Amino acid sequence: MSKKVAVVTGSNKGIGFAIVKGLLRRYDGVVYLTSRSEERGRTAVSQLKELGLNPEYHQLDVTDRESVLRFREHIKRSHGGIDILINNAAIANSAQLYNSHEENEEIININYKSILTIQELLFPLVRNNGRILNISSDCGHLSNVRNKYWIERLSRQDMTVNDINEFVEWFLKESRNGTFKKEELADDATAAAYRVAKVALSALTMLQQNELAARNISVNSMHPGLVRTDMTQGVGFYSADQAAETPIYLVLDAPQNLKGAYVWFDRKVLDWYDYNADYYFKSKTLNG
């Protein structure tokens, strides 16, 4: 019988690196550290080997279809499938709370559109009874959206990926045209593209769960808390190792029937649809 396989995208540093480290200490199987930059990935692998841990490594740029295809072929050839897939590769809004259109496009591509590619190319490799975890954010709760039309469309029981994609494209069009209004999103639309991407990802998670339910694969999204990483410029309440605890719980210990959920860093399952809730990201928390 082939060994079980866990894959963590964007895992050469921060939460992803901490998740790989935690899995290597607990998971009875192969754990893949992946990164866009092979050099940085190999450095991260060396750091883990110094701790007596032994990850596998493969280059993976989630925004590059050819890179994802190469990774897919490697996994098929070497292992035949994946048992745990953690979609962690992400980029925030750099140091600014407001961004140029080009930055907005990059943020959307990495945090949302790349997941569509992963879904198309890697989800078929996830074995029956496997687990998929999308690392979202408090920016990913529906309460980040203030536009009533989009709240309604994203709350529909018959929501499709087309609804989510149109939400994302609406934002990009408004951004490109300079017509986006700050009242469309919470907190004066700070980190707007990141909010839009993570809301889209959290919504997509529920559709992914529906598609994979017949194979008893659990798909969840989660907010890891404000973590001290490069992405938050070192601001945060938790270390990366602490933040990795709930993601590791969700893929190793949570009941298999926890499916399609939006989970907070304290393992509490939240009502994602409660758009009046106080779960949205507040930029003042970045002031430490």
What spans do the regions from the language model cover?
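Canonical Rossmann dinucleotide-binding motif of NAD(H)/NADP(H)-dependent dehydrogenases/reductases
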Residues: M1-Y32
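Conserved glycine-rich Rossmann-like NAD(P)H-binding loop of the short-chain dehydrogenase/reductase
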Residues: Y27-T43
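Rossmann-fold cofactor-recognition segment
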Residues: L48-E66
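Conserved NAD(P)H cofactor-binding loop of Rossmann-fold oxidoreductase domains
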Residues: N88-A95
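Short alpha-helical oligomerization interface
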Residues: A95-N109, D188
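Catalytic loop of short-chain dehydrogenase/reductase
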Residues: E105, R131-A213
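C-terminal helical subdomain
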Residues: T117, S221-M222, T229, Q233-K284, ...
